């Protein structure tokens, strides 16, 4: 997609069931109204932090609303793999976060291959960026450092940067961004966890090809 800055393009990837899946799990599986019990997010976060990376074999393919990149399959369906009686809601919550992070890793690898450049870091915004656990999972699954920004509203900030350049306050988008975008924190990948997730990603990426013929229409 063309960039509004001086030159160049940016690559966009999209997961149709991102944080939506967390709310779906809480509302539909746990039967909890987050409006009446907002502390459930903190409780699940604490429970999931007690679970080892990899969720003791529980893996979730987060295709509840089909999948865009990397497969672009409107018929794709979500999948829960490796469920045992030893798993609890903390495992499920962590497995959801890990599944979304795995998808981000696959999308990033595809972009890096397409453009021939390496991604060094991620900048997180929005509600998910407030989760210490999720930031660490993203860092560990990708092997890249994760930045949290001082502003959660990237769209508004981007509009402000564009307006500042148009008004002549800055000579370029680069200069405007350097003055208006600020990093609040950095999460570094854990080397041991990164190795475990790298092994899990090898298994994870086999799930979709293995099950896609099961749910295809007419089969």
Model regions and ranges:
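Active-site core segments that coordinate phosphate-bearing ligands/cofactors
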Residues: 1-125, 129-219
């Amino acid at each position: 997609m063309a960039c509004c800055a001086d030159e160049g393009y940016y690559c966009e990837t999209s997961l149709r069931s991102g944080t939506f899946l967390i709310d779906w799990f809480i509302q539909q599986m746990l039967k909890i109204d987050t409006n009446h019990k907002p502390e459930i997010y903190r409780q699940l976060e604490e429970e999931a932090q007690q679970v080892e990376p990899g969720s003791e074999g529980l893996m979730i393919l987060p295709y509840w609303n089909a999948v865009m990149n990397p497969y672009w399959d409107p018929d794709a369906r979500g999948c829960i793999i490796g469920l045992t009686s030893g798993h609890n809601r903390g495992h499920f919550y962590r497995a959801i976060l890990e599944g979304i992070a795995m998808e981000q890793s696959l999308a990033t690898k595809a972009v890096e291959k397409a453009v021939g450049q390496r991604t060094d870091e991620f900048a997180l915004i929005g509600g998910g960026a407030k989760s210490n656990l999720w930031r660490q999972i993203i860092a560990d699954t990708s092997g890249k450092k994760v930045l949290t920004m001082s502003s959660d509203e990237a769209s508004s900030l981007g509009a402000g940067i564009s307006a500042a350049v148009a008004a002549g306050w800055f000579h370029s988008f680069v200069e405007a961004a350097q003055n208006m975008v600020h990093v609040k924190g950095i999460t570094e990948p854990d080397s041991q966890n990164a190795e475990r997730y790298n092994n899990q990603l090898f298994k994870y990426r086999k799930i979709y090809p293995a099950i896609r013929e099961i749910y295809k229409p007419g089969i």
